[in-house]
């Protein structure tokens, strides 16, 4: 059974196309106009093992907010649709990812109940010219809402001796950890083929 989805989201602020194959090999075709965000979405494809296409045209003449938010909403919707009735999946996934001095833990429950907890230290306001670090939390919140998942992302360690956290490392480790957790949670459990992983019988 194919676990793929295509989502188009069009507003007066953005036009977003997302295609995903949960059982892919990490292929990615990403273009949002926000270079560092593109780099992060490539992490989702590579470390999640998903084939992922994301094409976004947004009102970047204003700022990156709408572009990043609507892309995350469309990505979450694509994951939700690709999962179908969620039968046979592992449901839970977690990963702890180091990136030099940074250590991040992510945990996912494909629960049908959107809830996001995000904890990171204060960071420099921008990575590159247009990626506002304040948007990382909002990306996870938007993704969690539309994917209908519970998501915890905790930066466990970030400080460099005698210096401020490296924002690039802190954010990239988050995307890698979430990707690895999603890979585990969306994986098919061969012991429970066709069985929804809930005593309620639905997610």
Curated annotation (Swiss-Prot):
Its main location: cytoplasm. Keywords: Amino-acid biosynthesis, Cytoplasm, Histidine biosynthesis, Lyase. It is an enzyme of class 4 (lyase). Its EC number is 4.2.1.19. It catalyses: D-erythro-1-(imidazol-4-yl)glycerol 3-phosphate = 3-(imidazol-4-yl)-2-oxopropyl phosphate + H2O. One of its GO terms (biological process) is L-histidine biosynthetic process. One of its GO terms (molecular function) is imidazoleglycerol-phosphate dehydratase activity. It is found in: Cytoplasm. HAMAP family: HisB (MF_00076). This is Imidazoleglycerol-phosphate dehydratase.
């Amino acid at each position: 059974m194919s676990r793929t989805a295509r989502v188009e989201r069009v507003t007066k602020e953005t036009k977003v196309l997302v295609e995903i194959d949960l059982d892919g090999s990490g292929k990615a075709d990403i273009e949002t106009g926000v270079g560092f965000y593109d780099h992060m979405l490539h992490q989702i494809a590579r470390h999640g093992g998903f084939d992922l296409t994301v094409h976004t045209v947004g009102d970047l003449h204003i700022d990156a907010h709408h572009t990043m938010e609507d892309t995350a909403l469309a990505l979450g919707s694509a994951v939700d649709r690709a999962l179908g009735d969620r039968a046979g999946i592992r449901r839970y996934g977690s990963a702890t990812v180091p990136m030099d001095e940074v250590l991040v833990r992510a945990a996912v429950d494909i629960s049908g109940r959107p809830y996001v907890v995000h904890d990171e230290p204060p960071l420099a306001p921008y990575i590159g010219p247009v990626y506002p670090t304040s948007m990382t939390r909002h990306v996870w919140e938007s993704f969690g809402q539309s994917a209908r998942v519970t998501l915890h992302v905790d930066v466990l360690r970030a400080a460099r001796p005698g210096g401020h956290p490296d924002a690039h490392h802190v954010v990239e480790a988050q995307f890698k950890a979430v990707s690895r957790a999603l890979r585990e949670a969306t994986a098919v459990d061969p012991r429970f083929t066709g069985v929804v992983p809930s005593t309620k019988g639905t997610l």
